[in-house]
Amino acid sequence: MSCCDLAAAGQLGKAGIMASDCEPALNQAESRNPTLERYLGALREAKNDSEQFAALLLVTKAVKAGDIDAKTRRRIFDAVGFTFPNRLLTTKEAPDGCPDHVLRALGVALLACFCSDPELAAHPQVLNKIPILSTFLTARGDPDDAARRSMVDDTYQCLTAVAGTPRGPRHLIAGGTVSALCQAYLGHGYGFDQALALLVGLLAAAETQCWKEAEPDLLAVLRGLSEDFQKAEDASKFELCQLLPLFLPPTTVPSECLRDLQAGLARILGSKLSSWQRNPALKLAARLAHACGSDWIPAGNSGSKFLALLVNLACVEVRLALEETGTEVKEDVVTACYALMELGIQECTRCEQSLLKEPQKVQLVSIMKEAIGAVIHYLQQVGPEKQKEPFVFASVRILGAWLAEETSSLRKEVCQLLPFLVRYAKTLYEEAEEANDLSQQVATLAISPTTPGPTWPGDALRLLLPGWCHLTVEDGPREILIKEGAPSLLCKYFLQQWELTSPGHDTSVLPDSVEIGLQTCCHIFLNLVVTAPGLIKRDACFTSLMNTLMASLPSLVQQQGRLLLAANVATLGLLMARLLSTSPALQGTPASRGFFAAAILFLSQSHVARATPGSEQAVLALSPDYEGVWADLQELWFLGMQAFTGCVPLLPWLAPAALRSRWPQELLQLLGSVSPNSVKPEMVAAYQGVLVELARANRLCREAMRLQAGEETASHYRMAALEQCLAEP
């Protein structure tokens, strides 16, 4: 058989590729072309390569492209099997005068024909050809060679068919196909557009695995696409807007890509566009905001104008979509606009190194306020049947981001919406699994560092915590939250989240959002302790909360890197103990003693005596563990000292316990070893408050303080109340 005959036989693959979607019954195909059956029989009975080649040629001539239906293709496979194509793909001995790639082309053509059957496309004999098929994409050769072009087309046909099977993307990635596709695209040889299309499909199906296996090659493609995007002057720039989000890496985006992408977006969004042109650009900008925050936007006047333009366009789109009741909402576009609004909120509240100037911030806050009003209007229309929809979740998210920074504006509208928000958060909390699914669906459009994750089933509540923390300070909103049952929900939520930090759980893998959420819950409870003490006394959920705080603090204060959470727990527990002092759980039980011992440890270890060069006397200084977090901690520390002071007369066993811990003695010793000038007046007042209450509550405490030169120390620091107390018998 001649080389030309082999090439002709290779057209069988073409026929398979061009096969019509309609599949006539086999008996109809037979009656229309009875010769085909004889040739298929010859193919099955072929005894050597030459006979198989001849039979394939006869089959090819006997049928037209549209005549090969799925059943016929399957019968050809039954006659040929995989052994023959395998030999064609791997042979290194071609007939004289026949280029070896022609044999491989025939082998690939046969596979392409077989792969049009989904069952065969997932066959192990096809899957194990993935590595060799991938090499054909980057093989060098004459670009005008028809056989080579045919082989490239057939190769893409095979790989695309495999990608369409359930586990196909995983096999392609493992077989090196992603790198081969990247190289084929970057080489811009024949079929490079097919390489890009298949890459897009693989990234959409298995983004993480693709980047893990071929990050350098994918970054090279991103660089090429970004450069093309920056230079594009025709409609291709809008097509690239749709492609580029898929090629943004899960890690750092190269700076040169960011420059090109920002420049291209600035040119697009600065022009007058129709919605089909503008929307992909907004979605690309949202993905960049998600991946990089505002780092992709250059500093200076051009960058600030671009950011202001982004947020303006996003707010206009949100208002147009949500203000008109009954208007069809393009949820993917509006959710992308939410991400850009969140970027605007972050930049407007940033004090240092903000891209925006103050007049721009004022203007954007006003514009965003109107868009948030539209979001509230939309949420007011949401019925129970829509509460599990991802777009509702995204709308609550952007509202939560706004309320975390601004609660004074739109106060009436926010108060009217609070009952819905409490019910919505409760619904998702109680159906944690569904809430987790929702969070994963919208996570890619979030841009804050507290992106929802699988360890946080109560997403909606977490998103609302910062805003509720502000609102519980105000009488009106606080009354609504209490009436709707928010405190009870928050207690349950806190206890559930606390389980994630308990022994037996690996806290090193917890997202920061868990601890931040716990701290924010503590702040809300602190607000309620101060503004609604009656609620703490009468609601049983706070008794359960107190028990959890008492059980948890002893181990928490021993853990490295969790001092801020320990401060919140200690201070909240001390303040609640004053209100619940008559509770049996606080009457010197092991749990209560353990809690107060841990609270004393937290309060007593904040400061140390530190020697200073050239001075005979040490100064009072923060201990190393407290230095880095004191700015966030000091208010809690002073509040904790005040709360402990208030607990001493209410709990008779507390003063003897404090004496056994040697805190009063060590405190006086510390004050006696440092220069009084180094102790700030507010510190003196805090220390005196504790010492005075301990001295008043217990005679043994007074005696121990006198033995520690308490009267002299009180005189040095002008602690008149302590000096007077120690002078009493």
UniProtKB/Swiss-Prot annotation:
Q: Which domain of life is it from?
A: Eukaryota
Task: Kindly list the residues that the UniProt entry marks as S-palmitoyl cysteine lipid attachment points.
Answer: C3, C4
Residue numbers of Phosphoserine PTMs: S2, S448
Q: Which organism is it from?
A: Bos taurus (Bovine)
The cross-references to InterPro entries, in alphabetical order and at most eight, read: ARM-type_fold, Neurochondrin
Posttranslational modification, per the record? Palmitoylated. Palmitoylation by ZDHHC1, ZDHHC3 and ZDHHC11 regulates the association of NCDN with endosome membranes. May also be palmitoylated by ZDHHC7.
Query: Quaternary arrangement and interactors, per the entry?
Result: Interacts with MCHR1. Interacts with SEMA4C. Interacts with DIAPH1 (via FH3 domain). Interacts with GRM5.
List N-acetylserine occurrences by residue.
S2
Which residues get modified to Asymmetric dimethylarginine?
R75
Membrane topology (UniProt): Lipid-anchor
Instruction: List the GO biological process terms.
Output: neuron projection development; regulation of neuronal synaptic plasticity
- Taxonomic lineage of the native organism: Eukaryota, Metazoa, Chordata, Craniata, Vertebrata
Outline what the protein does: Probably involved in signal transduction, in the nervous system, via increasing cell surface localization of GRM5 and positively regulating its signaling. Required for the spatial learning process. Acts as a negative regulator of Ca(2+)-calmodulin-dependent protein kinase 2 (CaMK2) phosphorylation. May play a role in modulating melanin-concentrating hormone-mediated functions via its interaction with MCHR1 that interferes with G protein-coupled signal transduction. May be involved in bone metabolism. May also be involved in neurite outgrowth.
Its localization reads:
Cytoplasm, Cytosol; Endosome membrane; Cell projection, Dendrite; Postsynapse
* Principal subcellular localization: cytoplasm
Q: What is this protein called?
A: Neurochondrin
- One CC-aspect GO term: cytosol
